[in-house]
Each structure stands twice: as C-alpha cells, then as structure tokens.
From Swiss-Prot:
One of its GO terms (biological process) is lagging strand elongation. Residues 180-189, 362-364 are annotated as: Interaction with target DNA. The lineage of its organism: Eukaryota, Metazoa, Ecdysozoa, Nematoda, Chromadorea. Signal peptide: none annotated. It comes from Caenorhabditis elegans. It catalyses: ATP + (deoxyribonucleotide)n-3'-hydroxyl + 5'-phospho-(deoxyribonucleotide)m = (deoxyribonucleotide)n+m + AMP + diphosphate. The gene is lig-1. GO terms for molecular function: ATP binding; DNA binding; DNA ligase (ATP) activity; metal ion binding. This is DNA ligase 1. Pfam families: DNA_ligase_A_C, DNA_ligase_A_M, DNA_ligase_A_N. Residues 687-700 have a biased composition (Low complexity).
C-alpha cells in the first residue's frame, strides 16, 4: 500500500484499470504550485501509484510528464501553433475566436482560458472520463497528421479531445499541445522522480525511513540517470525496470547503435594560460574546431546506418551521400559502431565553407548535385563491435578509430590534431586553424579524466575560438522574446529585439539584453517574415523581464540567435540569473552583436541562466569589478537606432552620455582571415621546432594530392594527426598574444566608430560556432 506524507492512503483508482487523465492533471496542478525538491516528491508519489495499480501505463505517464510522445530521434512533436489552438478551443466551447483572444490577453495562458471556457459551458451529459493512454494515443495521432488538410484535421481532433475534458484537464491538454507545460519540471527532475518511485513501490515495510530510505532512493536515481544517458529511450528503460528490476538498468540499458545519445560538450576558454591551468600535468591533444554540424554516425549489426544531430534528430535522409560512401571508410572486421564526427560544407576546390552554407542543405535526399557538398571529420569512437567505449580514455578511443577506419579523399578524414603541451606550438596551431577557415581549437585530455561524458559540458574538453580569445569566453544562444518596430532604414521590419536565456529549473525565459547590431537588411527581412507566425497577444507568464523593456511585438519561444558581446555586467532591469546572483539582481550583456540564427537549437536548448552566471564570474575583470560601478551602467542606454542616416545599416551601441568609441568595436568586427593557398603557406618561414618536438616536418600526402589539383584543399588537411608529425606552416602573431593576424585590416577600427559616419558594408552573415563540440 502506498501512503502519502500525511500518512493517509492516497486517492486510488481500481487496480488494473487505466490511469485517469484527471489524476495526472491534478498532479501537474500540484507540481505547478510547489517549488524545488517538493516537485520531485509529488511526481514520485504519482509514479508510485501508477506502478502499484497500472504499471503498463507508466511509460505514457513519463513521456507526458516531459511533454514528449516518444524518443527525440523518432521526430514526433506536438507544438501546435497558437492560432490553431484558439480555433480548437473556440470550436469546442462554442465561443468566438475573438472572445478567446480577448481572454488570452487578460490571462496570458491559453490553457487557463480553455479550462475556464469549458467550465462555463453547459453540457447535456457528462462525457466519459479520459484516461492517460487515451490522451497519449490521441496526441500521437494528431502529431502524425500530415498533408494539405492536416491543420484542419488537427483542429477537429483537438476540439473533440477538449469536449471530453473536465475541469483542470483542459488546461494541461492545451499546454501539452502548445509544447510547453510551464510547471517548472525539467527532464532531470522527472528522472529523479522515476528513481524514487522504483524505490517506494517495492517498500512494504513502513519502518524503512530516514537515511536508509534516502540512500536507497539516491542509488536508484543514479541507476536511472546513468541508464538514460546511454539509452535515452523511456520505453526500453521502463521495460527493463519492470521485468528485471531497477538494479538491472545499468547493465541492460547500455549504449546501442540506432539510439543516439546526447553528445559531450566543451567549456569555453579565452587563452593558453587558462588551458595550461586546467590541464596542469596532463597530456592533451589539440584538434581543429570545424565550422560544421555535429554528426553522430551509427552502424548496427544488421548493416543499417543512421546519422543523428547533436539534438538526437535523425538526419539520415539529409546526408544520403555520406551513407553511400561510408562503407569505403570502414575497415575490415568492423560490424557495428558509433562515431562522433563533424560534417562540414566545402566548395569545389575543397575549401571549408561556413556553417551558414551547410544550413542551406536540403533536409531530404540532398546530394553533391542538388545540395551542398560535404566532408566528414571523424574525431571520436564511442562504440565498437558490440562494446561501449565511453568509459575508456580518449587515447584508446582515438587509437581504435584510426586503426579501424580509413581516410577517403574528398569524403572522410580524421580531425587535424597535434598532441602537445607546449604553448608556442598551441599558439601556432591555433593560428593555422584560423587561417584555414576553422573556428579555433578543441583541447582535450588524452589519458587522465579522459572518458566520454555523455550529455555533459565537461572541463576535460575546452574550446578556444577566434571570436572570443581575450574577450568574453563564449558566444550565447538566446531566445527572441519580443521585438521593437523599426524606423528610418528599418521601417517595415523590426529594428531590434529583446533576448532571453532559459532557466530549466523554472521553465522560464529571463531577459538578458536588447539587441540591434550585426544585422544585414536580408537578416531583418528574413527574421520579420519568420516571426509573423509566432506573434502572441500578451507576454506569457513564463517570460521574465522588466516592464520598461516591454517590446512592441511578443513571440512564442521559437527563434534562437547566436550573440557575442564585449562584456557581461550586473543589471538593475534584466532578469537573467536574478535568483542566482549574490544581491538578487540580474545579468545583462554590453554591446551585444547578432551573429546568426541557430537553426539547430530549440528554445529550451538556449544558453541557461546558470551558464550566463558562470560566464559573468569567469570574466577576467570579475575579481576587480564592483557592483556599484556595474549598477551605474544602464546597458539598454547602449541600444540606439540610427534612423536618419541613409548610409548606416546597423544600429550603433552608445553608452548614454559617452562620446567614446565603442570599446568592443575592434574585437567584434574582425573578419575571419582570408583562406591562404598551400603555395602561400610554403613561402613563409616554418615555425622553429620546440624543445618538446624537434622532429623534422613531414609533408601531408593529402596536401600533395591537393597541390596537384591546384586547389586550396590542402588548407583543410595540412596537419598530421600523429604526435611529433606536425605540418605547421604559418608563423604569424597569434591573437592570443593580443596582436592582429596578418590579414586583419584597419577597417575594423572604423566600421563601428560612434564618432565617424562610415558607409555600412554589405556583408554576408557571419557564420561561426555551430556549438557542435
């Protein structure tokens, strides 16, 4: 028998019957009102009841708790547009769409509007009670609808479900359909609740309490989370737990080809000094950081091959050319594997193209003839011939990768790398990577603390990019919460945006800056078009920003911008990390600049509040920064639109009352150095051998082949992947040493000057970090 904390028997339904949807909705209502650990406890009680009375329904309950219909890689998504939901609510309740919209403006939550509309509706007969499996199956059917009349069919199906809802059920049904539950319950909390439930459902002795019970729950939570990391499939996880026990999860739910895992990610770093501090007395390797898309390539024992994105989306149909050619890359005796790689766009000469180009590739049936040509850079092996390798050190994984896979010219290569702890060599290797259209370097431990940490951003991997060396340690991916109407040159489009980070604990978006810099006219036109379908009448309750920042138009969380900035500061108005700072104030960006749209990220994948706080604390100036000084700066006074200057395209950020030039203008306007042909590299004197490595420089066979074709392909593959066999050709001042690269011009000093009026250049959108690390 399951007992609540009050000691009384919890509300039950008949054993063996289906879980009532109302019981699930009431649980969500309670969770919405609770905070912290109490949310997990409440959900754990519900899961325990399900295990006791209707264990077959547990999988549907768990998926609905995380607002999913299946594993991410199956691609079943709800996310019904707000306008369609309004139509369905109006149809189900007999009210006009205008009245529904009016209530929505007042309430700010369509789920609440639907609940009240149904409660006020007179019914001739009480509808049959909904069950969790019934709702889950209906939602799955709705998600699978496609074709020209799919939206009308969805509205009809949703309307029918709403008619069957009673009371609180309508609120959470609509929220699920919208794709946002907004109860402050993240996936990690659901996994914890599941671990607690597996513990509580087995305990019949009420004397098992206190530390002993907590210890049992903690052990099972660890089992559940470990199993889910390697096998992110609730169907499989719950099946094993029910049939073989929670103790069998780690052994039975291992990494398996065909089930993508969330990749290991890197922490940003601003220079060599930080790298050497982090990796003191550790062997490490440096790899070029390619400007592409993360590609997780799986081969099963039956020969099927799949390619998944960093978000576990199935990209197999996007890269049929890779699937077709990969067999030639696989060595003899290889039966199954999971490879971590980077897919990069190249031109006909083999020159690396930016991620912006790759993002234009067709999502289905793309080839060299009708799409963007790509190559694959392999850098890690996670599973090989039936054995998971994630707990083995990188050196061993890399050895197996290079032994059992082959380079195929024009298609597959190993990531260009060098094993070294010498700062001069790292500097030179960084310069070479930047010269060859890469974003910078990935620095990784080889032997100690060198396992593959699934779904974690680890300090065992560091990324050093050209865009933030000696500046803020990383770019940010921020959600567009709202926009401000444009004037002057920007009349008819949006002139600027309100951006926010994501707080996964509260499931809220917290404002972090206003932005109006870095956009081309093409960018603004494209964004305006995209956002028209995302407009909502009122800022939702899960948007946190000061009333003085209210935008002209507000949007549902959809579009994600990659942004860089000069500085991160305490803010009296912005809400980012406001509950995490010492004084409770928020954090904001100074001189933010748009880089590109992150098509590969959902709104919940945006930079988190904790990451923003960490970036603030990691600034070099943090130790000397006084809050009083930070408070004196109103970062939004720097948001100014140049509406009367025909020659100016971009907005200029100016501090109120300041006549000084933008202090970040040099740093943010440097362009990527132009690619240099292999012959130009050879004219420069080679870098002197370091004390660590005095072996002669060897010429890469790939480079020789490329030179015969008289193309710059050698620029991509010029360095050896073996220790002490580097092919570093460029001797140029490193940006790490605060000097410009030879290709930097003084134009960047003029381009953002606030005292001079210079014609704005028509530039292509800067394409940088795909954050595919």
């Amino acid at each position: 028998m399951f007992f609540s904390k009050a000691g009384k028997a919890a509300v039950e339904w008949a054993k063996g019957s289906k879980v009532p949807y109302k019981e699930f909705a009431l649980t969500l209502e309670k969770i919405e009102e609770l905070s912290g650990k109490k949310k997990v406890d409440e959900l754990a009680q519900f899961f325990t009841k399900v295990l006791d009375f209707s264990p077959d329904d547990l999988t549907a309950c768990v998926y609905m708790s995380v607002n999913q219909l299946g594993p991410s890689y199956e691609g079943l998504e709800l996310g019904v547009a707000e306008n369609s939901l309004i139509k369905a609510v109006a149809k189900a309740t007999g009210r006009t769409e205008g009245k529904i919209k009016e209530d929505l403006r007042a309430k700010g939550d369509l789920g609440t509007v639907a609940q009240q509309s149904r409660s006020n509706q007179k019914m001739l007969a009480v509808p049959k009670a909904l069950t969790v499996p019934t709702v889950f199956n209906k939602l799955t059917e709705i998600a699978k609808l496609s074709g020209t009349s799919a939206m009308n069919k969805k509205v009809d199906a949703i309307s029918a479900l709403l008619i069957a809802c009673q009371g609180i059920e309508a609120r959470f049904l609509v929220r699920m359909l919208a794709g946002k539950m907004r109860i402050g319950l993240g996936e990690q909390s659901v996994l914890s609740a599941l671990g607690h439930a597996f513990t509580l459902s087995k305990i019949t002795d009420q004397k098992v309490r206190g530390d002993k019970l907590d210890s049992l729950k903690d052990a099972n939570v660890k089992r559940v989370k470990t199993a889910y990391c390697e096998c992110p499939n609730y169907n499989r996880l719950i099946e094993v737990a029910l049939t073989e026990g929670v103790e069998a999860l780690v052994e039975k739910c291992k990494l398996s080809p065909g089930i993508p895992l969330k990749p290991m990610l890197a922490h940003p770093t601003k220079g060599i000094d930080e790298i050497m501090r982090r990796f003191r007395n550790q062997t490490m390797t440096c790899e070029w950081k390619y400007d592409g898309e993360r590609g997780q390539i799986h081969k099963r024992e039956d020969g099927q091959i799949f390619i998944y994105s960093r978000n576990q989306e199935n990209n197999t149909t996007k890269y049929p050319d890779i699937i077709e050619k990969i067999s030639s890359c696989i060595g003899d005796g290889v039966t199954s594997f999971i490879v971590d790689a980077e897919v990069v766009a190249i031109d006909e000469a083999g020159l690396i193209l930016p991620f912006q180009v790759l993002s234009t590739r067709k999502r289905k049936n793309a080839t060299d003839d009708n799409g963007v040509k790509v190559v694959v850079f392999l850098f890690d092996l996670l599973y090989f011939n039936g054995e998971p390798l994630v707990r083995k050190p990188l050196r061993k994984r890399r050895e197996l990768l290079r032994t059992n896979f082959k380079k195929i010219d024009g298609s597959f290569y190993f990531a260009t790398s060098v094993d070294t702890n010498d700062t001069d060599e790292i500097n030179s290797f960084f310069d070479e990577a930047v010269q060859n259209k890469c974003e910078g370097l990935m620095i990784k431990t080889l032997d100690t603390e060198a396992t593959y940490e699934i779904s974690r951003r680890s300090h065992s991997w560091l990324k050093m990019k050209k865009d933030y060396v000696d500046g803020v340690g990383d770019t940010l991916d921020l959600v567009v919460m709202g926009a401000y109407s444009g004037v002057g040159k920007r009349t008819g489009v949006y002139g600027g945006y309100l951006l926010g980070c994501y707080n996964p604990t509260t499931e809220e978006y917290e404002s972090v800056c206003k932005i109006g810099t870095g956009f081309t006219d093409e960018d603004l036109a494209e964004q305006y078009k995209i956002l028209q379908d995302k407009k909502i009448d009122k800022s939702p309750s899960y948007y946190q920003f000061d009333h003085t920042l209210k935008p002209d138009d507000t949007f549902s969380p959809y579009l994600v911008f990659e942004v860089k900035c000069a500085d991160i500061t305490i803010s009296p108005r912005h809400k980012a990390a406001s509950g995490l700072t010492d004084d409770g104030k928020g954090i904001s960006l100074r001189f933010p600049r748009f880089l590109r749209i992150r098509d590969d990220k959902n709104s919940d994948d945006a930079t988190s509040s904790e990451q923003v706080l960490e970036m603030y604390k990691n600034q070099e100036a943090f130790a000397n920064q006084k809050i009083e000084k930070a408070d004196a700066v109103d970062e939004d006074d720097e948001f100014e639109e140049k509406e009367d200057e025909e020659e100016e395209l971009n907005m200029t950020n100016v501090s109120e009352g300041s006549s000084k030039e933008n202090p970040v203008k040099e740093e943010i306007k440097k362009e990527t150095p132009k690619s240099v042909s292999p012959k130009k590299f050879e004219k420069k004197p080679p870098v002197k051998s370091s004390p660590v490595n005095k072996s002669p420089v060897k010429s890469s066979p790939i480079k020789k082949e490329a030179e015969k074709k008289k193309g710059p392909v050698a620029s991509i593959f010029s360095s050896s992947t073996k220790k002490n066999e580097k092919d570093v050709k460029v001797e140029s001042p490193s940006p790490i040493r605060k000097k410009k690269l030879p290709s930097d011009s003084d134009e960047s000093d003029e381009e953002t000057s606030t005292n001079k009026k210079q014609p704005a250049k028509k530039r292509s959108r800067v394409a940088i970090d795909s954050d595919s690390d």
